[in-house]
Amino acid sequence: MMQRAPQPIACLLGPTASGKTAAALAFAARAPVEIVSVDSALVYREMDIGTAKPSSEERAVAPHHLIDIVDPVDAYSAADFRADALRLVGEIEARGNVPLLVGGTMLYYKALTQGLNDLPAADPEVRATLDADAAREGWPALHARLAAVDAVTAARLAPNDSQRIQRALEVFMLTGQPMSALLAAPARSDDLAKGYRFVPIALEPSDRSVLHARIAQRFDAMLAKGFIDEVRRLRARGDLHPGLPAMRCVGYRQAWEYLDGETDYDTMRDKGVFATRQLCKRQLTWLRAMPERIVVDCCAGDAAGLALQAIERVIAG
């Protein structure tokens, strides 16, 4: 018996402010689509403005998944995403609808399409120990500690990159092996994704300055919508702190510093825009490492229409 060819699944990927939502909704207007978010910030509840979460009107156009599923105090990993996304794709197809993956968290996409490395799950006790060490010695000291056991990882991290330094030390403490060595090992394979062929459609700028201008405009619009008040409400809960993954999201970290009195308003705004541009740069680096991607110029006048055509070609096989 002939084996069924893998089902093509369109994945609309792109950096911040590249027009992913507009393109996805254009497709949703023409097909029975359900959108699966590929975004590590949209998973968090109570974080709407700073994540540019789709509005209730936009979500009414088509069902959206993996949005508002986690409390900001909790963690959500690439492994969690992979399991959820594969389950959802199967459920959406079983309903007779078309799954469309949309987002910009490239680590999630890599986990989905290439499998997972054999890294341990987060350990609250180890993290608490490292947080205490950092409070006493400072993150540069922990960066030096990391360099002694995993020089490869330490070399690519800034001395104050607390999130990644902590994770790399945590992995070493739990496994006795450098994280760089574990990441270099072949990813664990399974049969869960073998029935699908995930096709990346990349919204990339022909003129990066256009994207930079959009990023600045979007951050200013977030501020005008009440982003600072949103962060104030999160702080008022009392159970959140700047070390949590949710509060390390771009924009939230800068707003938290501002509300702590560490920066003034204009500096916070400029740092937020700069951090978003740096995120965009990293996203584009990931995208350009995908030779199989279909490229759509997000600066084109009809970028949404071009992306729509690409999605329809993928779905048609």
UniProtKB/Swiss-Prot annotation:
Major enzyme class: transferase
Keyword terms, alphabetized: ATP-binding, Magnesium, Nucleotide-binding, Transferase, tRNA processing
Enzyme Commission number, as recorded: 2.5.1.75
Positions annotated to bind ATP: 14-21
Gene3D superfamilies per the UniProt record, alphabetical: 1.10.20.140, P-loop containing nucleotide triphosphate hydrolases (3.40.50.300)
UniProt catalytic activity: adenosine(37) in tRNA + dimethylallyl diphosphate = N(6)-dimethylallyladenosine(37) in tRNA + diphosphate
GO molecular function: ATP binding; tRNA dimethylallyltransferase activity
Region (Interaction with substrate tRNA): 39-42, 163-167, 248-253
SUPFAM superfamilies according to UniProt: P-loop containing nucleoside triphosphate hydrolases
Pfam entry (one): IPPT
Swiss-Prot/TrEMBL cofactor(s): Mg(2+)
Family statement drawn from the similarity comment of this UniProt entry: Belongs to the IPP transferase family.
Task performed by this protein: Catalyzes the transfer of a dimethylallyl group onto the adenine at position 37 in tRNAs that read codons beginning with uridine, leading to the formation of N6-(dimethylallyl)adenosine (i(6)A).
Cited NCBIfam families: miaA
Name of the protein this chain belongs to: tRNA dimethylallyltransferase
The gene coding this protein: miaA
